[in-house]
């Protein structure tokens, strides 16, 4: 819509200038004004191109990373916390253990055939039918995305692991 306003505005200005220009003396002013308007339009177009180039540069990576496979051919599900600086705290709460090098571990990798999450009460096993539920719970609930609610997230994952659907397979 913003792109539509600029040409309409320019056309209005050109029409106004053309109707106001009645003598040869004002014709030079009109030409100068038209040149100035054209320069402004070029600047607007260049800035719009620069903005779109910046948006495309910051575009997210392709979804090819979701199709990672293990040596046995099973798909790997990677879970990334929203705030990577809090990764160590999240792992500490869920596992009860500290990571030796938190910068080295950028994601929790789970095999989809048997998802395993380590929890203070022991490891949680998720069957292959539960992959989508674990992914949705981890990424789409505020309990697993807000650092203050990580204990709730651990409780929800524990409850999910106890369901019939996740224990099958």
UniProtKB/Swiss-Prot annotation:
Keywords annotated in UniProt: Cell membrane, Cytokine, Disulfide bond, Membrane, Secreted, Signal
Tell me which positions the record assigns to the signal sequence: 1-25
Disulfide bridge positions per record: 130-166, 144-153
Where mainly located? secreted
Gene Ontology molecular-function annotations: cytokine activity; receptor signaling protein tyrosine kinase activator activity; receptor tyrosine kinase binding
Subcellular compartments: Secreted; Cell membrane
Q: What are the boundaries of the region Disordered?
A: 45-68
Q: What is the reported phenotype of gene knockout?
A: Fishes show reduced dense iridophores in the light stripes of the trunk, particularly in the anterior region, resulting in irregular interruptions of melanophore stripes. Fishes lacking alkal1, alkal2a and alkal2b are embryonic lethal and display total loss of iridophores.
| A Pfam family matched in the record | ALKL1_2
Would you name any one GO CC term? plasma membrane
In which tissues has expression of this protein been reported?
Answer: Expressed at high level in the notochord and iridophore stripes of the trunk, as well as in the eye and swim bladder.
Enumerate the InterPro entries for this protein.
ALKL1/2
Q: Where is the composition biased (Basic and acidic residues)?
A: 52-67
> What PANTHER family is this protein classified in?
ALK AND LTK LIGAND 2, ALK AND LTK LIGAND 2-RELATED
What family is reported? Answer: Belongs to the ALKAL family.
What quaternary structure, including any partners, is listed in this protein's UniProt entry?
Homodimer.
Sum up the protein's function in the record's words: Cytokine that acts as a physiological ligand for receptor tyrosine kinases LTK and ALK. Required for neural crest cell differentiation and iridophore development during embryonic iridophore development and adult stripe development by acting as a receptor for LTK.
Q: What is this protein identified as?
A: ALK and LTK ligand 2a
């Amino acid at each position: 819509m913003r792109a539509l306003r600029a040409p309409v505005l320019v056309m209005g200005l050109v029409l106004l200038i053309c109707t106001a220009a009645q003598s040869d003396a004002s014709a030079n002013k009109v030409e100068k004004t038209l040149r100035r308007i054209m320069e402004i339009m070029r600047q607007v177009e260049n800035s719009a191109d620069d903005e779109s180039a910046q948006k495309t540069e910051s575009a997210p990576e392709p979804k090819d990373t979701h199709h990672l496979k293990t040596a046995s051919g099973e798909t790997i599900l990677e879970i990334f916390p929203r705030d990577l600086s809090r990764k160590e705290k999240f792992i500490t709460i869920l596992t009860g253990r500290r990571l030796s090098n938190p910068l080295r571990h950028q994601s929790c990798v789970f095999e989809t055939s048997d998802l395993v999450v380590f929890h203070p009460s022991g490891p949680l096993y998720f069957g292959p039918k539960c992959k989508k539920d674990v992914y949705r719970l981890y990424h789409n609930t505020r309990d697993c995305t807000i650092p203050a609610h990580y204990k709730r997230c651990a409780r929800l994952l524990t409850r999910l692991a106890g369901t019939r659907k996740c224990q099958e397979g």
